[in-house]
Amino acid sequence: MKPACTLLSLTLLSSPFVVSAQENIEKTFTFGIVSNKAQSKIKKSTPFTQYVTNGLAGYGYTKGAVKVFKNYRQLAVALENGTVQIATATPFNAMTLEAESGSQAIAIRWKKGLQKYHTVFFTHKESGIESISDLRGKTLVFEKRTSTSSYYLPAITLLNQGEKLEYLPSSDDKPAKDSIGYLFLDEHLAQSNEINLSVWVYKQRVAAGAFSNFNWSNPKDLPDSMKGKLTIFARSVEIPRDLILASPTLSQDQQHKITSILLGMETSQQGALALKQFQNTKKITALTPEMSASLNTVRTSIHLLPKVD
């Protein structure tokens, strides 16, 4: 005898009400994140996901779920095949997801209260460096190769200005005279952070450093006792702090509805609380022409980034 569930399926398939039954199948709305801290991310983003899900009952979504992926390649597959409906990512990762999955950035997430930011290039006041071209033949320190403000963004800023970049495995190595040498702080220190990056520039172990304008303004990342000896000599374009992307499997109507829910979250007490629990998100806003233009810069430049083994 066949199992009851199989018999039930056969009954539904032969029923004249099969279409309406399929339309009313309960669906799960899934939010995708990349992290190595799965349990923490699930806990913090579940209220956010459930809030969005509650507004999508008309599309058959009755449950919300958070799925954490180990890398963006896995998330791209999930967005492309529709097992994940929306996801969050920083601009460079978001543009990679767009290219690999066909997903689309639909809104800006004010992660940790910030709408946008940019990279500052800074040096010791006694270095003689006044512009990007002065970095040729010298060494620039980035924090780590996964950092937006302390690698991706400053690197494409240099490349778009026609500069050559040369990876240096050791801090004792020197770049060619016509190249800008760069290294990653996390490959040289057990504790890689913004304050240690500031110290390297302050002590002139390297010619310059790069991190976000918010790091520059934060005494925890750059103490006032050091800041007086340092100076900013260049800045990148401003980019969104974080983005929400939608799966290409969603209809335009569904995308518009989801976007509408996201943009209105801060206006309700429950929505605002859900945002705050999710990495202290202040609000979610629409992409402005300025931010769309900066994303296009990222989109057209990301292939320029050097491949470092």
Spans of model-derived segments:
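Hydrophobic residues within well-ordered alpha-helices
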Residues: L79-E80, L135, V201-Y202
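Flexible hinge/capping segments at coil-to-helix
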Residues: T123-L140, Q161, L165-P169
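Bacterial N-terminal signal peptides
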Residues: S9-S15
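Hydrophobic/proline-rich hinge and linker segments of small-molecule sensing/allosteric domains
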Residues: A107-S131, I244-S247
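Extracytoplasmic small-molecule ligand-binding "clamshell" domains
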Residues: N24-M95
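Pocket-lining segment of extracytoplasmic ligand-binding domains
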Residues: V141, R145-S251
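An extracytoplasmic/periplasmic, membrane-proximal ligand-sensing/linker region
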Residues: N24-Q50, I239, L245-A246, L250-D309
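Short loop->beta-strand "edge-of-pocket" segments that line small-molecule binding or catalytic clefts
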Residues: F29-I42, D134-Y151
